[in-house]
From Swiss-Prot:
Keywords: Hydrolase, Metal-binding, Pyrimidine biosynthesis, Zinc. Gene3D superfamilies: Metal-dependent hydrolases (3.20.20.140). It catalyses: (S)-dihydroorotate + H2O = N-carbamoyl-L-aspartate + H(+). Catalyzes the reversible cyclization of carbamoyl aspartate to dihydroorotate. Binds 2 Zn(2+) ions per subunit. HAMAP family: PyrC_classII (MF_00219). Zn(2+) 2 binds at K98, H135, H173. It is an enzyme of class 3 (hydrolase). GO terms for molecular function: dihydroorotase activity; zinc ion binding. This is Dihydroorotase.
Amino acid sequence: MTTLTITRPDDWHVHLRDGEVLKDTVRDISRYNGRALIMPNTVPPVTNTEMALAYRDRILKEQHGEQFEPLMALYLTDNTTPEEIRAAKATGKIVAAKLYPAGATTNSDSGVTDAKNIYHVLEAMEEVGMLLLVHGEVTHHHVDIFDREKEFLDTVLAPIVNDFPNLKIVLEHITTADAAQFVNNASDNVAATITAHHLLFNRNHMLVGGIKPHFYCLPILKRNTHQQALIEAATSGSKKFFLGTDSAPHAKGAKESACGCAGSYTAHAALELYAEVFEKEGKLENLEAFASFNGPDFYGIARNADTVTLEKSAWDVPESMPFGNDIVVPIRANEQIEWKVK
């Protein structure tokens, strides 16, 4: 196969940051996506409706594709109120709220300290039909970083799923076979996003032959058996899994340092990277559902009406890309990607 035409995709989990870098991050995400769900862990975090709408306006000023629509999310804190959830839902532009366990990832210090603290908020979300997005890691110091997702499933997510059976929940950027199994075994109200980099790489890519800081992300890359479980889930055709890049840019110097930031940048070539994975598995026929159908279907939003075409045409990824007044090193820098969006 040399070309593949699919319904225009969406990215259900992306970080655009804010300020001067938006012109670059929005350029990449709006190039062929119909919609993207914008993560709210900016500085300061997007904790209320007014902030979310203002952030949306800043994004729209930089968009490059007329078809592109940013979908917004609120950042949940211990102080979020049910009234804020209702106000956000009423806008029609804020489609979800994000649970970051405090300290779990970049700019998450204002996150939720205990899920029980927001049960009254989850009740309001269940009532109005707002989705809950979850960064699925515990932050207890005694839990090994490679075990944080599994521990979260058992101690935090399972009780939420049980206590709020009508709440739609997306377990974001899953990284383990345990998470894939949890989602498969849960009700149809539980789904998951999977990143391109967790499908393409495992912890050996990050650690063998020297530390590769641009592979460092949270949740951290796991062993190859977990990687294979993610590949099987993503390419299976199951409606429970869909595209969410978790593309998370940091300036080159913030990654290549003694205490580097977590996040991998894939928005420059996300669909192309996923296409490589699906082709290698002999499952290209399932890429459209993963990239273009399952996400909007789960969110209760119409699928995009137009299409994009991928062609089998290798191209060179640049060594770096503009990032405001700095540069970002994209995944597969100085290497080739086999597919290209026409």
